């Protein structure tokens, strides 16, 4: 039944006010939309202890699929624990994991490249049905210390791209204040499916990526709602609908109205609202396209 027909039935006496109709419309719209968080961190200590409650909240707002992404030994293990442990409790949720190495751990010299890649490879082989991407393929020069181990970041980046190639998995990219350095490496791996998470550059960089990479996805998170983030909203408008993914990056980057609070996967519904407004399309149309994109990225 279309929502318009529904309203004609429940409001035959004209007793509903406009704001009540809007609330009811939004409630039922959420019920018929399937939403997806392409990048979250339930495996992190801020969220992991209460992961069941966060998953329940996600399901309540129409959540259907999410991918837990992090990149050190403990968080990789936690991500696999969530995927395994949620099968019985949340049979209708598609919950998978991404494995990799975070550059902070690279800087802490937790191990050499070969040792860490071997460990990740073993985890993938043991949990092949749960692992859907390689992360963290990362070049980050936002803080001064990033430049001090740029060479090691590059080594791990290339090694993880090779791992993605070996297992035919997409790579999830974090790039901050390092677009040219990131692009230099990605040009060596144009055969891979590339997901730029938490977009933080300008529309011109979107144009460069679109012109060079055929298998490209761009992730937008709660920062598209920030008043001063016009360059990110402009980047969203520059991105093809077939390339857009939505994410929370929880527990980080809560959308406007919730800033300063711990983020959670359920708030991806709010990201979708802001994104649809920015694009000038309905939330239903956006989420239908995001669902298609989500499956193309993570299921191939």
Q: Which stretches of residues belong to each language-model region?
A:
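Short, low-complexity, intrinsically disordered N-terminal modules
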Residues: 15-16
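Mid-domain alpha/beta scaffold segments of enzyme catalytic cores
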Residues: 12, 22-300
């Amino acid at each position: 039944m279309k929502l318009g027909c529904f309203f004609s039935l429940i409001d035959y006496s004209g007793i509903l006010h406009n704001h009540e109709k809007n609330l009811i419309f939004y409630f039922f719209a959420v019920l018929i939309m399937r939403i997806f968080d392409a990048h979250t961190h339930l495996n992190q200590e801020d969220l992991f202890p209460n992961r069941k409650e966060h998953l329940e909240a996600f399901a309540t707002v129409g959540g259907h699929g999410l991918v837990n992404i992090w990149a050190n030994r403990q968080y990789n293990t936690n991500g696999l624990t969530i995927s395994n442990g949620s099968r019985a409790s949340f049979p209708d949720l598609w919950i998978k994991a991404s494995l990799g190495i975070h550059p902070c751990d690279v800087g802490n010299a937790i191990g050499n490249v070969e040792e860490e890649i071997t460990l990740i490879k073993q985890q993938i082989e043991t949990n092949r049905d749960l692992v859907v991407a390689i992360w963290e393929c990362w070049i980050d020069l936002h803080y001064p210390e990033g430049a001090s181990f740029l060479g090691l970041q590059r080594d791990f980046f290339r090694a993880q791209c090779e791992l993605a190639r070996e297992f035919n998995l997409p790579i999830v990219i974090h790039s901050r204040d390092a677009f040219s350095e990131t692009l230099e490496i990605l040009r060596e791996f144009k055969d891979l499916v590339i997901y730029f998470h938490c977009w933080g550059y300008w529309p011109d960089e979107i144009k460069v990526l679109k012109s060079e990479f055929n298998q490209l996805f761009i992730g937008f998170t709660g920062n598209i709602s920030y008043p001063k983030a016009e360059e990110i909203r402009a980047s969203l408008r520059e991105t093809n609908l077939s390339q857009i993914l939505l994410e929370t990056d929880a527990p980080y980057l809560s959308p406007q109205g919730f800033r300063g609070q711990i983020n959670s996967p359920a708030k991806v519904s709010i990201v979708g609202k802001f994104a649809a407004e920015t694009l000038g399309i309905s939330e239903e149309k956006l989420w239908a396209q995001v669902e298609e994109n989500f499956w193309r990225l993570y299921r191939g």
